[in-house]
Amino acid sequence: MKTVLMVAEKPSLAQSIAKILSRGNMSSHKGLNGACSVHKYTGTFAGQPVHFKMTSVCGHVMTLDFLGKYNKWDKVDPAELFSQAPTEKKEANPKLNMVKFLQVEGRGCDYVVLWLDCDKEGENICFEVLDAVLPVMNNAHNGEKTVFRARFSSITDTDICNAMTRLSEPDHNEALSVDARQELDLRIGCAFTRFQTKYFQGKYGDLDSSLISFGPCQTPTLGFCVERHDKIQSFKPETYWVLQAKVHTDKEESLLLDWDRVRVFDWEIAQMFLNMTKLEKEAWVEATSRKEKAKQRPLALNTVEMLRVASSALGMGPQHAMQIAERLYTQGYISYPRTETTHYPENFDLKGSLRQQANHPYWADSVKQLLAEGINRPRKGHDAGDHPPITPMKSATEAELGGDAWRLYEYITRHFIATVSHDCKYLQSTISFRIGPEHFTCMGKTVISPGFTEIMPWQSVPLEESLPTCQKGDTFTVGEVKMLEKQTSPPDYLTEAELITLMEKHGIGTDASIPVHINNICQRNYVTVESGRRLKPTNLGIVLVHGYYKIDAELVLPTIRSAVEKQLNLIAQGKADYHQVLGHTLDIFKRKFHYFVDSIAGMDELMEVSFSPLAATGKPLSRCGKCHRFMKYIQAKPSRLHCSHCDETYTLPQNGTIKLYKELRCPLDDFELVLWSSGSRGKSYPLCPYCYNHPPFRDMKKGMGCNECTHPTCQHSLSMLGIGQCVECENGVLVLDPTSGPKWKVACNTCNVVAHCFENAHRVRVSADTCNTCEAALLDVDFNKAKSPLPGNETQHTGCIFCDPVFQELVELKHAASCHPMHRGGPGRRQGRGRGRGRRPPGKPNPRRPKDKMSALAAYFV
């Protein structure tokens, strides 16, 4: 029998689809990468019996990046990134080994059916999958079609089975539009980001951002936030005056009346009107009206509206809301959550979707009433031609989902029910009064039929007292007329919901990328999220936007990105040439980049006002090896050391604490060592600031601390403190942390493995001797006599932490969130692989300390 390979976008989706198509009769096993499962079953395809293999990827298989040497910031002019720097497709997550996994599963298959998400990104992933599997599949006979695309909008039996019977082809134009967007964002973003990051971090010490990034979508998004901030700052409150009248009915009921003039900004004029009315005793009814009005039911739900409500009503950030929606979709609770459409298709089964909710404990009564009376025809919205609106696909309870997932599901379901409910109808009563020469009005609303507000109570018409019955010519007693002094108020900072609306209006980003752009400006420390999910720009965000406006406003205005998005959509529709759009857009931004570089002094003037130069920032910490003066430690991101005398800046490890290391000095350059620590339970290691930035040996790279330094005699180096190969990763070496006592630690110098050992020992030292079994360095341990774990109250022991049974009970391995005793091999580990420094995969360097240290040192300088 022939074999059909089917590929979904996520492992959970693959399992759900396979379960539906196989009717639960399938076998499953983990793939070679450990992340994706393979589900097998037999069935029919193209009228013949076949073997089906259903598996998945984990999002994008490949990512776009520059060739190796162009990723070195210090050696490449950012201007070269626009055209001269070649790009290549790399595996998005090398640890998953996705290409090899797809090739193994695709080898010998005859057909491939692509079940990737039905959007532009999904089409792009289709071709990434095809690039991996087509070369290893069986050759087609007589031009037989072998590549198929399944299109679906929800994970339901009906939708999946229908998709399987209506297979089509992947859309190459949509995939190309994604390639174009990726390349534009990479080249433009990297060029501007590298230039401004290097320029400003080399001059200012309190920017508090490790990366001063620029993005064609990210920067206009920030621009909206700063524009609102500028309006708030430039706002000047004005005083105005309002007349307020209170009248009484015969039954002593009081009514507050609104002045028809609303307000006046001249006190004398307001006082004149007050004088003309305050002595009047009666208010005359000049007109009454009663009108029936309707509040429209909502349009069908699309992504942007869902994100707006999630932020404003549920308090969820757009990124978080989108992640929850995707999880609900993959679990089959809602339809595909990325859509711009607000109009149900003509063949959409509204009654069927509604019946699924008929027994729900929260809204069963409303649904049953709707089904009995007949559903209302939904409003005609916008049909973007992508996916149906977001709807619930099955009933779920709060106990079943819980937390934010339930809150979002509840809103989606209530919104769906509301779209097929009736409009809310209410009666609006208005009475017009005259007090002296001035006119006042009183309004009231009475609900006739709640309609959709019964299922969406937060949308209900505000309750107001009903107005008394009266007619033209009636009089009411004037209780008082007073003048109120008020002031105009500035607008508030943008909420996430308002920002999403602005981005949609100006065409910045897509329904899928809008949450990413908002999340980026938060992570870059350009804005902070205040109460009410309002976005307040930071000093850095404000200065950047003002600088862009000063140099080239189009870098921050939404117009140019909106035009680019339209061109990308034309590529997706097959109406524009990929290479022409790419070349034209890059040429425009290349010119803008050169002008930006030439005019950077304009932004620098703004930076000078808001931020402190490096020399005036930070606190003295360690001595420079060149001038022997104190260097200043700048704690703000990115943390670094700056010598104002030599005008040199040295980068440091991030996301930890830095302190002076016992005033010890590096034997190579005389710089004082500093100690980096990620916390009491994490890693820590000393480093030389100069060696960290300028590696002294050929086998070292920039960013290596003393725990990776191969100096043969330095007491802090890998050569003196290295023990043996890491138990988890291929290239790492476990190194003793000499600063960790009395709670001693051994940590890998590459991955996050930390072994806690020998608590309360007086002294731990790496011996020159090695283990006969695994060739790891032995440890000499001197225990506290009162707390010695050794038999016979002995205090000293020398052994191997991998092989010595005494030490094995005293060593606990930690990495990520797991911990376990450190044994060689063991369940779940790569059994059979040596843990010592003598057993290594072929081609791996041997990190043993050199026996002939002087020969080794000489070898470095030859």
Curated annotation (Swiss-Prot):
Matching entries from Pfam families are given as:
Topoisom_bac (PF01131), Toprim (PF01751), Zn_ribbon_TOP3B (PF23546)
Any one biological process term the GO annotation gives: chromosome segregation
Q: Which residues form the Toprim domain?
A: 3-153
Tell me the function of this protein.
Releases the supercoiling and torsional tension of DNA introduced during the DNA replication and transcription by transiently cleaving and rejoining one strand of the DNA duplex. Introduces a single-strand break via transesterification at a target site in duplex DNA. The scissile phosphodiester is attacked by the catalytic tyrosine of the enzyme, resulting in the formation of a DNA-(5'-phosphotyrosyl)-enzyme intermediate and the expulsion of a 3'-OH DNA strand. The free DNA strand than undergoes passage around the unbroken strand thus removing DNA supercoils.
Identify the species of origin. Mus musculus
Q: Which gene encodes it?
A: Top3b
Where is it expressed, tissue-wise?
Answer: Highly expressed in testis.
Its Enzyme Commission number(s) read: 5.6.2.1
Q: Which SUPFAM superfamilies match?
A: Prokaryotic type I DNA topoisomerase (SSF56712)
Which residues of this protein are catalytic? Y336 (o-(5'-phospho-dna)-tyrosine intermediate)
What is this protein's record name?
A: DNA topoisomerase 3-beta-1
User: Where do the record's region annotations for Disordered lie?
Assistant: 820-855
Q: Which UniProt keywords apply?
A: DNA-binding, Isomerase, Topoisomerase
